[in-house]
């Protein structure tokens, strides 16, 4: 595709959980829980007017669903602030300091005062119907291989509650995540190539990972804003996989182009969405379709001039009918039937013909059927009509959900500025030079820069250095080597790989202190243990953390034998296998090495064993 000709514009919104000791406006812990809740809180939410007296369209759309909300609460991880039964406490200064660090790394202007606002969110993910948020910095930039990208804003806000279960009557959330500090980074829409947006997301991720942020699945959420010249701005939520970003962009552009084609064809045909909702119960009294026969009510609407367009592909494996169905599903139905895909689902051609006759459907017309309880079916068809009418506009502004296959699905209308109003329970926070300057003077090293430096300074492989940085072990690695003169590679291997294996065996690696690790590697530096014994000794230290490290090594037979003792053991093994040595000559090296290592049981360094075995064979020959 010619992205420039299409007028492709993209921007990013990245939400990153901060690794603070407590939540943004209360003292509760910021860890997630997977255990039985202590209490259930129930709420019903409705939209309120902004300061200008207007109601946000996304909030209004959610309220029309009429859902009840249940919230699971926990001791130590939730309190009355999360359930909106107590005013918020003071702003978490630690979270603000992390945001200032992020802002400085992205060349941003840090605001003088942090004002907390309320942003309406009535999908149930916030018990009060709003999210607390504030602006921390503006007007920054990052220099990328594609040129400079502007960073419009950096916000600090509360994370939302976790969705646990959704039924026809209610949605259940868990309050452990609600209130965890979240940094929101927004770029301007100046990116014009799918690969560029992936590169910028990666670079922002590098900035975030150099600061005190949470790591792991669900701790970072990336949203894409995409538009083309004849289309409209669409926000795609929850892009987790950077490798999928380019494909998501391409599929969204394909969708917008297809919707523009549908618009042009609808106008050419003088198409029309008829208002009447028809009852088809009598036509399907004897149907073999399991879905229709089990439904309380079967309703339909006629879309004049839509024939062939509902089945038109808008994304790989998704059609215009899928777009319409996504709107209908918001009213509680599992899907729709449209004439472009029938007969199917147990509906016969004769039944299709009888529907066409009953509805007086012409050759260019289409119809859509919904089967459910009567009120739900009518409500869903109202949404069908609304989405079909939006087809005359081409692309409409909306928020969509990222799917694992690179496609997207409708979530809700695009929010407007009408959902923001001032939080009166929290005073402003003055951001002074005394707070900012020490942070600016001690900025962290970016991960890629740190990795390259570690490779150069310690002669590590790129893989080992990458793992150290990725697993946040680089600082511990350097601290050990500052105090202990030892080969860097076994230190890096233990931190990057072996500790993970020890953890998989069920041992608590958090027991290990940096002091423990330094003492282990001091034994290695003093030639008191072999490199091969480092992992085993680490396991023993976890099991006896209060014992002196050298005593632990001796008690577990991990201390090295003297050179003379090692030589004697190896020569005995070689002499016992003289016939094999005479027959294979240096080819006996492998088997004899294996026998020697088995006999020595880690009490000698492998490289030394290798040398002595080789010398013993040569002496015999």
Swiss-Prot record:
SMART domains, A to Z: GatB_Yqey (SM00845)
Alphabetically ordered keywords of this record: ATP-binding, Ligase, Nucleotide-binding, Protein biosynthesis
GO-annotated molecular function: aminoacyl-tRNA ligase activity; ATP binding; glutaminyl-tRNA synthase (glutamine-hydrolyzing) activity
EC class of the enzyme, as a word: ligase
GO cellular component: cytoplasm
EC code: 6.3.5.-
InterPro entries: Asn/Gln-tRNA_amidoTrfase_suB/E, Asn/Gln-tRNA_Trfase_suB/E_cat, Asn/Gln_amidotransferase, Asn/Gln_tRNA_amidoTrase-B-like, GAD-like_sf, GAD_dom, GatB_C_1, GatB_Yqey_C_2
Organism from which the protein derives: Methanobrevibacter smithii (strain ATCC 35061 / DSM 861 / OCM 144 / PS)
The UniProt record lists the keyword ATP-binding: yes
Encoding gene per record: gatE
Reactions listed under catalytic activity: L-glutamyl-tRNA(Gln) + L-glutamine + ATP + H2O = L-glutaminyl-tRNA(Gln) + L-glutamate + ADP + phosphate + H(+)
Protein's UniProt name: Glutamyl-tRNA(Gln) amidotransferase subunit E
Cited HAMAP family: GatE (MF_00588)
Residues spanning the signal sequence: none
């Amino acid at each position: 595709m010619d992205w420039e000709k299409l007028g492709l514009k993209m921007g990013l919104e990245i939400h990153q959980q901060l690794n603070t000791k407590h939540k943004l406006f209360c003292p509760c812990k910021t860890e997630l829980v997977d255990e039985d809740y202590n209490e259930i809180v129930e709420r019903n939410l409705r939209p309120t007017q902004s300061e200008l007296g207007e109601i946000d369209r996304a909030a209004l759309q959610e309220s029309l669903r009429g859902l009840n909300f249940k919230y699971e609460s926990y001791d130590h991880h939730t309190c009355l602030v999360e359930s909106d039964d107590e005013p918020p406490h003071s702003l978490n200064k630690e979270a603000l300091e992390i945001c200032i660090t992020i802002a400085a790394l992205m060349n941003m202007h840090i605001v003088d005062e942090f004002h907390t606002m309320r942003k309406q969110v009535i999908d149930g993910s916030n018990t009060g119907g709003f999210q607390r948020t504030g602006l921390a910095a503006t007007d920054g930039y990052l220099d990328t291989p594609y040129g400079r990208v502007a960073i419009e804003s950096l916000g600090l806000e509360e994370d939302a509650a976790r969705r646990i279960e959704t039924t026809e009557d209610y949605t259940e959330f868990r309050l452990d995540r609600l209130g965890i500090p979240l940094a929101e980074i927004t770029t301007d829409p100046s990116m014009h190539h799918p690969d560029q947006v992936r590169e910028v997301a990666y670079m922002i991720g590098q900035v975030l990972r150099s600061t005190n942020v949470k790591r792991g699945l669900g701790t970072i959420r990336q949203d894409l804003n995409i538009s083309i010249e004849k289309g409209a701005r669409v926000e795609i939520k929850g892009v987790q996989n950077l490798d999928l970003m380019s494909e998501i962009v391409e599929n969204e552009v394909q969708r917008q182009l297809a919707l523009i084609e549908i618009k042009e064809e609808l106008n050419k045909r003088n198409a029309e969405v008829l208002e009447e909702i028809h009852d088809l119960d009598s036509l399907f009294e004897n149907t073999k379709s399991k879905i229709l026969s089990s439904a309380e009510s079967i309703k339909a609407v006629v879309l004049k001039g839509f024939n062939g367009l509902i089945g038109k592909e808008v994304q790989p494996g998704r059609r215009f009918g899928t777009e319409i169905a996504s709107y209908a599903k918001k009213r509680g139905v599992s899907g729709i039937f449209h004439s472009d895909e029938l007969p199917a689902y147990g509906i016969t051609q004769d039944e299709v013909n009888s529907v066409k006759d009953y509805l007086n459907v012409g050759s260019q017309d289409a119809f859509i059927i919904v089967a459910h309880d009567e009120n739900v079916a009518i409500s869903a068809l109202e949404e069908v009509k609304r989405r079909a009418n939006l087809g005359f506009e081409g692309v409409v502004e909306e928020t969509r959900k990222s799917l694992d296959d690179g496609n997207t699905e409708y979530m809700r209308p695009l929010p407007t500025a009408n959902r923001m109003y001032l939080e009166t329970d929290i005073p402003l926070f003055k951001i002074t030079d005394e707070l900012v300057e020490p942070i600016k003077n001690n900025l962290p090293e970016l991960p890629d820069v740190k990795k390259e430096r570690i490779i150069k300074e310690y002669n590590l492989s790129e893989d080992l250095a990458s793992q150290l940085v990725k697993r946040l072990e680089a600082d511990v690695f350097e601290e050990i080597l500052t105090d202990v003169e030892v080969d860097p590679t076994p230190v890096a291997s233990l931190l990057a790989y072996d500790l993970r294996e020890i953890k998989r065996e069920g041992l608590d690696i958090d027991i290990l202190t940096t002091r423990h690790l330094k003492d282990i590697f001091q034994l290695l530096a003093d030639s008191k243990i072999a490199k091969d014994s480092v992992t085993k000794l680490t396991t023993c230290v976890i099991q006896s953390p209060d014992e002196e490290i050298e005593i632990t090594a001796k008690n577990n037979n991990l201390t090295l034998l003297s050179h003379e003792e090692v030589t004697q053991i190896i020569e005995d093994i070689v002499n016992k296998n003289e016939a094999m040595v005479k027959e294979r000559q240096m080819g006996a090296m492998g088997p004899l090495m294996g026998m020697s290592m088995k006999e020595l049981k880690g009490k000698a360094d492998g490289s030394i064993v290798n040398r002595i075995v080789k010398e013993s064979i040569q002496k015999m020959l």
